[in-house]
């Protein structure tokens, strides 16, 4: 997919850079594979903000994606590649030989008419899903499971992938884009290839309103708040906050490590860079 620039006939078009979606399906999604999705405005079931700066945005239909690829040894043909407003990657509508339809994450270079399959004996081909024990070392993968049968969790956003770098003692070692090396059980499944839409990282929204369409509200600085709202708030005139940057709850921000999960740390061979 190429990037699209615009003639600056308005100020917001001057900086706007979008992904060219002319090759994607222009119709509506398959109704049987969609469901309604309600907005939370960043609030939890108590009505308290748990995700700041969320709210508004265009209405969406949720596309039900098959992350598990549990239809084993049944070949499917790619009917079309679609845009999905719920994720940065594109999705592919596939039709199995028995007539069933399904949405999967579309990898790069997957085209309409291609055949994909989930099988232990599948070819090492873009879009095919296999257990890690059946995949040769050095293969580029996406939608990798962390627990057997749970469905893919690693490398699902636009342009991402992981590399299979080793196998030992019932575990596969994968290298993530962050530089982290991680162990995953060999019976976990993964899909061949890297995720579509790698140009997503190069887009420029061009104006604040386009961010609002995506459901993001303005990000307010702590120093612009009152003392009741933030540790950096208050002061006479403009102030610098008066302390090292912290979150609204007083914990250090700006890169302090917060991960505390000893139970799964044993699966991290090398920490991210």
Swiss-Prot record:
Q: Which GO terms describe its molecular function?
A: rRNA binding; structural constituent of ribosome; transferase activity
List the residue ranges of the region (Disordered).
228-273
The biased composition feature labelled Basic residues covers: 254-273
Q: Name one GO biological process term.
A: translation
Give the GO cellular component terms, alphabetically: large ribosomal subunit
Which SMART domains does this one have? Ribosomal_L2 (SM01383), Ribosomal_L2_C (SM01382)
Q: Which InterPro entries match?
A: NA-bd_OB-fold, Rib_uL2_dom2, Ribosomal_uL2, Ribosomal_uL2_bac/org-type, Ribosomal_uL2_C, Ribosomal_uL2_CS, Ribosomal_uL2_dom3, Ribosomal_uL2_RNA-bd_dom
Any idea which UniProt keywords this protein has?
Answer: Ribonucleoprotein, Ribosomal protein, RNA-binding, rRNA-binding
**Superkingdom to which the source organism belongs:** Bacteria
SUPFAM superfamilies named in the record? Nucleic acid-binding proteins, Translation proteins SH3-like domain
One Pfam entry for this protein is Ribosomal_L2_C
Describe its function: One of the primary rRNA binding proteins. Required for association of the 30S and 50S subunits to form the 70S ribosome, for tRNA binding and peptide bond formation. It has been suggested to have peptidyltransferase activity; this is somewhat controversial. Makes several contacts with the 16S rRNA in the 70S ribosome.
How this chain assembles, per its entry, is: Part of the 50S ribosomal subunit. Forms a bridge to the 30S subunit in the 70S ribosome.
State the family it belongs to: Belongs to the universal ribosomal protein uL2 family.
Protein name (Swiss-Prot/TrEMBL): Large ribosomal subunit protein uL2
Protein source organism: Rickettsia rickettsii (strain Sheila Smith)
Q: Which gene encodes it?
A: rplB
